[in-house]
């Protein structure tokens, strides 16, 4: 009986226009970002042949993200969610546009300055992500009923991770054959499709009324809420540090070049491996949501994620590296759903 009820809920979500539009928005924007990430990483490593440049690329993204995340959350509470979503997508279109003259070689005369342009572009991507993530979460809560959240979250995870599988592969193939220019164009086009999808979005639930608190009061209230909930704080901190110290994919261009002597196609496939694991785990969790012992699953997922990253670090072959990255995706999907 419960299986039939679960199937009915799943079918209702899949035929909901608003839910489909939201998933299209998420898929297209994720494809845009993944193609950009693969392309920018390969681009800057080709220019510098220095693993440090990849670390700086990640830093260029994370600093704007963390600096604007709290303000972005307040903006999402106060402003139109659709407009903020369009703003985030528009930044991705702007990034792709800015990177075209760099990829075409028009700015080669700047020499070392070219990489700083790439860092600046990725910084804009970090700023966009700060607004995109909370906006999606609020739109998700408005499109679905509370009782549908568990399965809706699992479906959203499958869509997200599916785009994370396709995006890097497409990016790697575009870099290998047509070249960097085509990859940046593809990233911009997917961002445009995301703008169209979210512009068409119609809520099926009455929108949440904006808070009357000031920006700083809202930020302080949010921080107090998180720090007052020890279980929430511990879970968030555990997941954050696991991801912070386990971001193996950031170094993949150097790993491909120095250890595997591979090509952009190999980069795309390895970057897609965690997402493949997440898709399979998410598909399972969509039909079998975790209802009890969430803390145990979270601890096990974080521990498994750490061991998989260590295994990847010791890998000397493409197959072994892909296998360990696959399991990082499996454990990451569990932690996200929990």
Spans of features found by a protein language model:
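Helix-loop boundary and gating motifs at the non-cytosolic
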Residues: 6-64, 224-274
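Substrate-agnostic recognition of the 12-TM MFS/MFS-like secondary transporter fold
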Residues: 20-38, 60-76, 80-95, 117-176, ...
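Transmembrane alpha-helix termini and helix-breaking/packing motifs in multi-pass membrane transporters
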Residues: 41-47, 100-109, 166-186, 258-260
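MFS-fold secondary transporters
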Residues: 45, 98-102, 106, 125, ...
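C-terminal transmembrane bundle of multi-pass solute transporters/carriers
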Residues: 67-71, 78, 84, 88, ...
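Helix-loop junctions at membrane interfaces in 12-TM secondary transporters
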Residues: 101-121, 313-324
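Helix-loop junctions on the cytosolic side of multi-pass membrane transporters
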Residues: 106, 138, 142, 180, ...
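A membrane-interface helix-boundary motif in multi-pass transporters
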Residues: 112-116, 175-191, 263-269
